[in-house]
């Protein structure tokens, strides 16, 4: 079984009720943090997960709302890990990830220096290993396998989606993307597809062109549902709601998805949990 927890279902727009985009995936005793939106560590704490307990951080792309708390994750995983010789935190993402991590650590350079000077058991900067991929297998440990494929979030590029597999169960995390053949292939037959969604029918009515522009590179609810249908997934899990879902609107969003997808449809608030079993 794979357990998916929507840690943050928000967007770049600050929302008092929704943290930034982030999803927790637990499989075979391993814990993966997919994207690092604002507030992610507080949401993770609510389900008993700390930064030092992460098996890896998986980044779909490098938009600010998806990496806003990456620096905090890197530092907190270091200062809260009390092992004598802690293993490096694994960070997996598209090309550009290593540069981004380096910049984050540089921004926290003074803090790192302060902590090394203060604590006798901290004698080196945070141990981080970064791996950049656009395609193929990126993880294969103790029965958990992860592979990636390109998605289409242009002009943001490159971007990737992740497929996590364990004991016959599978979950795909699409990140930000419009429909594309590579995502269809990655998601084919998966137990669940976690997909960012927007309401283009609402957004196109905004007067600001900058707001309308987000329709260029995000999937609408119906488009995400159509991707799920083409790929033959069991469950569509919607997240990254733009605009934010107002209480009482959930059935409306589900109905839009149901016009294109006949399977199980999941959406909800932060900390919404979905179990994915072998198919």
From Swiss-Prot:
Zn(2+) 2 binds at residues 65-66, 240. Gene3D superfamilies: Ribonuclease Z/Hydroxyacylglutathione hydrolase-like. Pfam families: Lactamase_B_2 (PF12706). It catalyses: Endonucleolytic cleavage of RNA, removing extra 3' nucleotides from tRNA precursor, generating 3' termini of tRNAs. A 3'-hydroxy group is left at the tRNA terminus and a 5'-phosphoryl group is left at the trailer molecule. Its cofactor is Zn(2+). The active site is at residue 65. Keywords: Endonuclease, Hydrolase, Metal-binding, Nuclease, tRNA processing, Zinc. Zn(2+) 1 binds at residues 61, 63, 153. Its EC number is 3.1.26.11. CDD domains: arylsulfatase_AtsA-like_MBL-fold. It is an enzyme of class 3 (hydrolase). NCBIfam families: PRK00055.2-4. Belongs to the RNase Z family. Zinc phosphodiesterase, which displays some tRNA 3'-processing endonuclease activity. Probably involved in tRNA maturation, by removing a 3'-trailer from precursor tRNA. Homodimer. This is Ribonuclease Z. It comes from Mycobacterium ulcerans (strain Agy99).
């Amino acid at each position: 079984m794979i357990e998916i927890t929507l840690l943050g279902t928000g967007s770049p727009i600050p929302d008092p009720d929704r943290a930034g985009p982030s999803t927790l995936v637990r499989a075979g005793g391993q814990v993966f943090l997919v994207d690092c939106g604002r507030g992610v560590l507080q949401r993770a704490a609510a389900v008993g997960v700390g930064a030092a307990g992460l098996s890896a951080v998986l980044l779909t792309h490098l938009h600010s709302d998806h990496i806003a708390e990456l620096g905090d994750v890197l530092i907190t995983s270091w200062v809260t890990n009390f092992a004598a010789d802690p293993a490096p935190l694994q960070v997996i993402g598209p090309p550009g990830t290593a540069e981004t991590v380096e910049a984050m650590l540089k921004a926290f350079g003074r803090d790192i220096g302060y902590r090394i000077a203060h604590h006798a058991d901290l004698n080196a900067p945070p141990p981080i290993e970064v791996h950049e991929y656009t395609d193929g297998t990126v993880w294969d440990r103790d029965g958990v396998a992860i592979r990636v494929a390109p998605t289409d979030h242009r002009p943001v590029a490159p971007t990737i989606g992740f497929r996590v597999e364990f004991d016959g169960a599978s979950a795909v995390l699409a990140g930000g993307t419009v429909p594309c053949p590579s995502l269809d292939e990655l998601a084919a037959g998966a137990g669940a597809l976690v997909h960012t969604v927007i309401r283009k029918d609402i957004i196109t009515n905004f007067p600001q062109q900058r707001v309308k522009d987000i329709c260029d590179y995000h999937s609408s609810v119906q488009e995400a549902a159509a991707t799920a249908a083409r790929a033959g997934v069991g469950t569509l899990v919607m997240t990254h709601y733009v605009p934010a879902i107002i209480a009482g609107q959930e059935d409306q969003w589900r109905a839009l998805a149901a016009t294109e997808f006949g399977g199980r449809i999941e959406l909800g608030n932060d900390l919404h949990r979905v179990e994915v079993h072998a198919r």
